[in-house]
A protein has these predicted regions:
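Accessory alpha-helical/coil subdomains and C-terminal extensions
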Residues: 97-104, 119-232
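Buried hydrophobic positions in well-ordered alpha/beta secondary-structure cores of metabolic enzymes
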Residues: 23, 43, 67-68, 132, ...
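Glycine/threonine-rich beta-strand-loop-alpha-helix active-site module
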Residues: 1-3, 48-105
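Short beta-strand segments
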Residues: 37-42, 103-110, 130, 251-254
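Glycine-rich oxoanion-binding loops at beta->alpha junctions
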Residues: 1-32, 81
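Short acidic, glycine/serine/threonine-rich loops at helix termini
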Residues: 48-53, 80, 87-94, 115-129, ...
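Gly/Ser/Thr-rich active-site loops/lids in small-molecule metabolic enzymes
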Residues: 54-72, 133-151, 263-282
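C-terminal non-catalytic interaction/assembly regions of soluble proteins
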Residues: 1, 235-282
Length: 282
């Protein structure tokens, strides 16, 4: 049987730590004769949270809520910090399973992360990696502090996290590209562009005689504003036949955010996007 742990996302909870401890237990008897497969996907930056020494899961939860819910910080800016306050991320998971042979897989399209399978781009991906926890990353403690300052979040960051970033040493830094390469590990993307929902939507639209256009696969904005812009394009197509002639299906994809502030809310980014778009079109 394969066990399952059900942690929270995007704000991590104690179940995240529980799941990581189970992974840690698996590594205790690893030898060089073992072959270890890991599979990670979207959301693992939160789901696979295992706080570094002197940082609690409650502090990381409060920090995550402040960054993503209150301030609307994109995951690409949050993840470098996550890797520096965690026991598994930033390649540390690969260290854990040394000296086994490692095969890392991700349920994402590597090309969408700017990682086509060429050697030079592969090294660039490792150097600037922010989305694949088992892999190395060239992001530093100084980068993390700069991100927090950019978002005016330093003063609201828990002291334990501040201290780790300020006192970071080479011994506690993320795994370097050179160290990761020395492991001889392999990395594969399991889901490619043609296996996503877009081809299916395009095919269904064609059955109804409708043209289908992807406005953006990399949308990163406030969900409400993204909905307003896409709805305005739909209205323009209907009323002026620009930039497309109606009838047409307009699609967009990416990772939008909803900045909630200190208040609480119900729903998510897709509801926010759709509500804003629907009210504009109506």
């Amino acid at each position: 049987k394969i066990g399952a742990t059900l942690p929270c996302h995007p704000v991590p909870d104690e179940a995240c730590v529980e799941g990581c401890k189970k992974i840690e237990a698996l590594a205790r008897d690893i030898t060089s004769r073992d072959l270890v497969f890991t599979i990670t996907g979207s959301g693992c930056g939160s789901l696979m949270t295992y706080p570094a020494d002197d940082i609690t899961i409650d502090e990381i939860a409060r920090f995550t809520h402040m960054m993503q819910i209150e301030k609307g910080v994109p995951t690409s800016d949050l993840n470098p910090i996550r890797t520096h306050i965690d026991r598994f991320k930033g390649g540390r998971l690969s260290r854990l399973f040394r000296p086994a042979t490692l095969v890392h897989m991700t349920t994402a399209d590597p090309s969408k992360q700017n990682t086509p399978v060429t050697r030079t781009t592969y090294f660039e991906m490792l150097e600037h990696n922010t989305f694949f926890p088992p892999l190395s990353t060239g992001m530093t403690y100084a980068d993390c502090i700069a991100i927090l300052q950019k978002w005016n979040a330093w003063d609201k960051t828990p002291v334990s996290i501040q201290n780790r970033l300020l006192r970071g040493t080479p011994e506690t830094e993320n795994m370097s590209v050179e160290e990761y390469e020395s492991l001889g590990a392999r990395f594969f993307g399991l889901i490619f562009k043609d296996a996503t929902v877009y081809p299916a939507v395009r095919k269904k639209a064609a059955e109804f005689g409708l043209r289908c256009v992807m406005l953006s696969e990399y949308q990163q904005a406030e969900a409400k504003e993204a909905g307003l812009v896409d709805a305005a394009m739909a209205l323009c197509a209907e009323r002026m036949a620009e930039p497309f002639r109606a009838p047409i299906v307009l699609l967009s994809s990416g990772e939008n955010v909803v900045t909630v502030g200190a208040e609480s809310g119900v729903g998510g980014r897709n509801q926010e996007y759709c509500t804003a778009a629907a009210l504009t079109i109506a």
